[in-house]
């Protein structure tokens, strides 16, 4: 007699859905952080599956830095309208008043004020006690040691030495008033898993992930796309049309593209099978020695 076995992707899907349902049942006011990227798109798809045929029982929160790619914002608004979920968009008002820019103020200050502080403001404003995120352990070394339930203190800080053990699929959801957790249902997924699942489930993606001729300039070894007129060109710089795509998405001045011919999901998957570099190599903030990912997370970053 044949036994029905879960495929690798089905097992990952089942684990993620179980985590989402458990958080929705145990916490008073959860939220899903929606950055519009591939991992967020998979999270949204899983949430729709987890609570089907009902509506997703928590809102989605986008912390907008005012420097996201135009295509990301258009995609966000279109998806929110299509699937009718509650979308909250927060911009740090202090940062907006100060005119914080990655060009004028640098990547570290921009990330701290517009992302980290903006996120903490939104979590405090709405009183969320659990926040789903799309981080995966294979992305970066500080994320590799983070729990599925990542506990944060009353100031949203992460202490890697003060986390709770997770035995099998048993999670400790007890928090004191004012404390919260960040929940990572995709912890055990890899970048390749994400793309294979997107292909299997036919999930809509931001076009920036697919190769296309785009205007870019090379700065410090990164291909930066000229997305709007706010990007100041250095002396002698002339945008060049190159066939590029993005493996990861963030603020456009801080996100490097890669040269690629992958215009379809199968081609992207084939590219992933052959790549030997991290997807976050294109993130300028990860190369900022003054602000490592672990330090950012200890200050309240995603």
Swiss-Prot record:
GO BP of this protein: hydrogen sulfide biosynthetic process; sulfate assimilation
SS bonds (residue pairs): none
Reactions listed under catalytic activity: sulfate + ATP + H(+) = adenosine 5'-phosphosulfate + diphosphate
Pathway where this protein functions: Sulfur metabolism; hydrogen sulfide biosynthesis; sulfite from sulfate: step 1/3
EC number per UniProt: 2.7.7.4
MF-aspect GO terms: ATP binding; sulfate adenylyltransferase (ATP) activity
InterPro entries, per database record: PAPS_reduct_dom, Rossmann-like_a/b/a_fold, SO4_adenylTrfase_ssu, Sulfate_adenylyltrnsfr_sub2
Alphabetic keyword roster: ATP-binding, Nucleotide-binding, Nucleotidyltransferase, Transferase
One protein family per Pfam: PAPS_reduct
Protein family membership: Belongs to the PAPS reductase family. CysD subfamily.
Subunit (UniProt): Heterodimer composed of CysD, the smaller subunit, and CysN.
Function: With CysN forms the ATP sulfurylase (ATPS) that catalyzes the adenylation of sulfate producing adenosine 5'-phosphosulfate (APS) and diphosphate, the first enzymatic step in sulfur assimilation pathway. APS synthesis involves the formation of a high-energy phosphoric-sulfuric acid anhydride bond driven by GTP hydrolysis by CysN coupled to ATP hydrolysis by CysD.
Protein's recorded name: Sulfate adenylyltransferase subunit 2
Species the sequence originates in: Psychromonas ingrahamii (strain DSM 17664 / CCUG 51855 / 37)
């Amino acid at each position: 007699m044949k036994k029905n076995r879960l495929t690798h992707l089905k097992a990952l899907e089942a684990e993620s859905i179980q985590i989402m349902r458990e958080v929705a049942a145990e916490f008073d006011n959860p939220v899903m952080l929606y950055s519009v990227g591939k991992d967020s798109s998979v999270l949204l798809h899983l949430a729709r599956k987890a609570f089907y045929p009902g509506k997703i029982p928590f809102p989605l929160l986008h912390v907008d830095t005012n420097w996201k790619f135009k295509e990301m914002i258009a995609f966000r608004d279109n998806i929110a309208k299509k699937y009718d979920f509650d979308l909250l968009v927060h911009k740090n008002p202090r940062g907006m008043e100060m005119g914080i820019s990655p060009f004028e103020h640098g990547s570290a200050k921009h990330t701290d004020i517009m992302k980290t502080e903006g996120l903490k403001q939104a979590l405090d404003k709405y009183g969320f006690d659990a926040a789903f995120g799309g981080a995966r352990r294979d992305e970066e070394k500080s994320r590799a040691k983070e729990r599925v339930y990542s506990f944060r203190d009353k100031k949203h800080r992460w202490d890697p030495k003060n986390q709770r053990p997770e035995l099998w699929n048993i999670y400790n959801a007890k928090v004191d008033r004012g404390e919260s957790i960040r929940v990572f249902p995709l912890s055990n997924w890899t970048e390749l898993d994400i793309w294979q699942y997107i292909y299997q489930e036919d999930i809509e993606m931001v076009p920036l992930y697919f190769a296309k001729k785009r205007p870019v300039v090379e700065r410090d070894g990164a291909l930066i796309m000229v997305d709007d007129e706010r990007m100041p060109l250095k002396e002698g710089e002339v945008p060049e049309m190159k066939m590029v795509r993005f493996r990861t998405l963030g603020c456009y001045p801080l996100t490097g593209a890669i040269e690629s011919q992958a215009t379809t999901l199968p081609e992207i998957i084939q590219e992933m099978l052959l790549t030997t570099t991290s997807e976050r190599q294109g993130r300028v903030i990860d190369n900022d020695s003054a602000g490592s990912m672990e330090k950012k997370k200890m200050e309240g970053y995603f």
